[in-house]
Amino acid sequence: MKVSMSLILITLSALVTIAKAYDPSPLQDFCVAIDDPKNGVFVNGKFCKDPKQAKAEDFFSSGLNQAGITNNKVQSNVTTVNVDQIPGLNTLGISLVRIDYAPYGQNPPHTHPRATEILVLVEGTLYVGFVSSNQDNNRLFAKVLNPGDVFVFPIGMIHFQVNIGKTPAVAFAGLSSQNAGVITIADTVFGSTPPINPDILAQAFQLDVNVVKDLEAKFKN
């Protein structure tokens, strides 16, 4: 059965598009990031030091045994270990976070534009979930997690975690990017700089414009 050349080209184009949606694969053993452009080569958003000058400290970080401060409006804290903390992560397409939650605290709805996330709960009880895209009718996928449970948040999906217990909770998550990025929905929509016209948001969210103005005042940077 013959396969048309156009079908082959379409398939190859799709594969290239998918490949570009993630951090590119490294073409060397490692590429330790440095801030000095005079002595480095620019790769994947960072300058790389001479591999012969790399040392163990370039691949090391400490402190994830320490709880983050959760005394804030959402009662949670995210401690990030990405390429900015471990320069040796540059080009390796992976990073890590520790998330601490006060009782009833939450990691509010947000998205990672460049990474899938896999989360494991170490302590406490969490209610977690993500919402699929418009094409999938915005379905909610949610579970209650206990210690040792694992949940995956696909790349780009809006997701959240809420501590539903009376005691603190701790989770660790791996991300499929050296710098996953984060877009917190409420902060982004109601706290942008400059602010979005409240009339636009009032129509989009079907709210009174004064409610929108109040929300923008709360989330103003």
Swiss-Prot record:
SMART domains: Cupin_1. Residues 76-213 form the Cupin type-1 domain. GO terms for cellular component: apoplast. It is found in: Secreted, Extracellular space, Apoplast. Mn(2+) binds at residues 110, 112, 117, 159. Residues 1-21 form the signal peptide. GO terms for molecular function: manganese ion binding. Disulfide bonds join 31-48. Keywords: Apoplast, Disulfide bond, Glycoprotein, Manganese, Metal-binding, Secreted, Signal. Glycans are attached at residue 77. InterPro entries: Cupin_1, Germin, Germin_Mn-BS, RmlC-like_jellyroll, RmlC_Cupin_sf. Belongs to the germin family. May play a role in plant defense. Probably has no oxalate oxidase activity even if the active site is conserved. This is Germin-like protein subfamily 1 member 17. The lineage of its organism: Eukaryota, Viridiplantae, Streptophyta, Embryophyta, Tracheophyta.
